[in-house]
Swiss-Prot record:
Classification via NCBIfam families: efp (TIGR00038), PRK00529.1 (NF001810)
GO BP of this protein: peptide biosynthetic process
Similarity remark: Belongs to the elongation factor P family.
UniProt-listed Pfam families: EFP (PF01132), EFP_N (PF08207), Elong-fact-P_C (PF09285)
Gene Ontology molecular function terms on file: translation elongation factor activity
Keyword Zinc: no
Protein name: Elongation factor P
CDD domains, per database record: S1_EF-P_repeat_1, S1_EF-P_repeat_2
GO cellular component: cytoplasm
Function field: Involved in peptide bond synthesis. Stimulates efficient translation and peptide-bond synthesis on native or reconstituted 70S ribosomes in vitro. Probably functions indirectly by altering the affinity of the ribosome for aminoacyl-tRNA, thus increasing their reactivity as acceptors for peptidyl transferase.
Subcellular location: Cytoplasm
This protein's UniProt keywords: Cytoplasm, Elongation factor, Protein biosynthesis
UniProt keyword annotation of tRNA-binding present: no
Designated gene of the protein: efp
Length: 186
């Protein structure tokens, strides 16, 4: 699908110079003299290199067509995470560095959305919120409630987040996977 330069947004995947690029930053500029343009900072998905490119407003780029499929998380080893398509029972593996820190939020049978580009898994999208158990946290001291204070907590998956003072070890909480922040207690 063709996109004009003014339609390019952060997070989009575009095909440019025979490579697949993820848009990191975009700024639309209308100088006093000359035509408007979009200054776009992109990162190559395959080569892990960055590129700053200037597109005139009249130029168009090709938006990458991604196929999105729901998968269930199965397990992990030292190198990969393993997922299964619940319809076909097909299993795939994805390198841990592809998912990054959010991989710690994966729990058995968690439904995720995997985007494919030319039948190659590209991104893994977790649900916006997941349920976790607080493994350890400090005891809240009386008198600390004058301001909205948070205390550090370690979850059962090893992730460290900030939680309100009333949260104790063993409590089940909901965590936002986009920001890795506490949402609410269950």
């Amino acid at each position: 699908m063709k996109l004009y330069a003014s339609e390019i947004r952060v997070g989009m995947l575009i095909e440019y110079k025979n490579d697949l690029w993820q848009v990191l930053k975009t700024q639309h500029v209308k100088p006093g003299k000359g035509g408007a343009f979009a200054q776009v900072e992109m990162k190559s998905v395959n080569k892990n290199t960055k590129l700053n490119e200037r597109f005139r407003s009249s130029e168009s780029v090709e938006k990458a067509s991604l196929d999105e499929t729901k998968f269930n998380y199965l397990y992990s080893d030292e190198i990969d995470y393993y997922f299964m398509d619940p319809k076909s029972y097909e299993q795939i593996n994805i390198k841990k560095e592809t998912i990054g820190e959010k991989g710690k939020m994966l729990t058995e049978n968690l439904e995720v959305s995997i985007s494919f580009y030319n039948e190659k898994p590209l991104t893994v999208e977790l649900p916006n919120q997941v349920t976790c158990t607080v493994d350890t946290t400090d005891v809240a001291l009386k008198g600390q409630t004058v301001s909205s204070s948070y205390k550090p907590a370690t979850l059962d998956n090893g992730v460290n987040i900030q939680v309100p003072p009333f949260i104790e070890s063993g409590d089940k909480i909901i965590v936002d996977t986009r920001t890795m922040e506490y949402v609410k207690k269950i």
